[in-house]
Design a protein with these regions (language model features):
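Extracytoplasmic ligand-binding site segments that recognize negatively charged/polar headgroups
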Residues: 134
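N-terminal organellar transit peptides
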Residues: 2-104, 109-113, 123-127, 138-303
Length: 303
């Protein structure tokens, strides 16, 4: 009886294999995920459009690849000037959860945060003319005092806490507050350097030499150890297949989910939309004012 059961199981496996082959079900795939645009937490902008790279997008695409047993390796097509520090860090955390080989393919530009999210991939491929690097941080805080005066707006400010109003943009920073801002920026810079050092197996001292904020071409980046190979997407796909020990894999290009108009409205929030509608009479200056008041805190970015 046991012998018969074993034979039945073998026959069933052979039949399933034949069915999967005849139906064209791939057993070995390389998934290609396109990541294009600035790095930020939300979806594409309502008024200015354009794609963005968000943690939510990266998470959903990587989860799909992780759950597909036929996907043996992943290629990330990165085209980004960088963006929000926190979003870059969250995306890198998502990438580090993947146990399958990951190869990054750089396009025209993969700078600052675009490089940050790629630094811990198994391999990085860049075109000779790719612009990459730009390892550094920029923190911006607008001073709205002149704009308020132009618009005829006077503000009464009440605070509790020595530096509570330093982020309001209503006055110049004191020397002490400028030191606070610089220390925060330096700390984020150190975090960037640590990620690159770990991901590229370089000493922190070496990375600091490279981390001047300048851009490098793909050729320069390879010479400096910031990328592994020169080539395009096909080079990255072949390299990913090689890392996964797969010959002639099927390449599956993941389509980017386009957020609906409704989801974009929900992401922005009803109150913010209402503010935008009300501020249109103020023109460009009003929009700048709205954006600053809606989030008056510093905007440190890897860009």
């Amino acid at each position: 009886m046991r012998k018969v059961t074993v034979i039945i199981c073998i026959v069933a496996l052979l039949v399933l294999g034949a069915v999967s082959t005849s139906c064209g079900i791939a057993e070995n795939k390389v998934a290609v995920i396109s990541l294009s645009g600035p790095v930020q937490s939300g979806s594409s902008g309502l008024f200015f459009g354009g794609s963005v790279i968000s943690p939510k997008l990266v998470r959903s695409q990587l989860e799909r690849a992780k759950k597909d047993f036929a996907v043996k390796a992943i290629v990330l097509q990165v085209e980004s000037p960088g963006g929000s520090v926190a979003s870059c860090q969250e995306i890198l955390n998502e990438i580090e959860t993947v146990e399958k080989p990951i190869v990054v393919s750089f396009g025209d530009i993969a700078a600052s945060g675009g490089y940050y999210i790629s630094a811990k991939a198994d391999k990085i491929v860049a075109l000779p003319g790719t612009l990459t690097g730009s390892i550094g941080v920029i923190s911006e805080m607008p001073n709205l005092k002149g704009l308020f005066e132009k618009l005829g707006i006077e503000m009464e400010v009440f605070t509790a806490g020595k530096h509570k109003d330093m982020y309001a943009g209503l006055r110049e920073l004191t020397p002490e507050e400028k030191v606070i801002m610089q220390e925060m920026t330096d700390q984020l810079y150190d975090q960037f350097i640590q990620v690159v050092a770990e991901g590229r197996s370089l000493s922190e001292a070496k990375v600091r030499e490279l981390a001047t904020g300048q851009l490098y071409t793909g050729v320069q980046a390879k010479e400096l150890g910031l990328v592994d190979d020169l080539g395009g997407l096909n080079t990255a796909i072949d390299l990913a297949a090689s890392l996964a020990n797969v010959k002639k894999p099927e390449v599956e290009y993941y389509k980017r989910e386009t957020p609906s108009l409704l989801s974009t409205f929900l992401d922005m929030g009803v109150q913010k939309l209402n503010n935008i509608i009300q501020v249109q009479s103020l023109g460009a200056e009003g929009i700048i004012l709205l954006e600053t008041l809606s989030n008056p805190y510093p905007q440190p970015e890897y860009r």
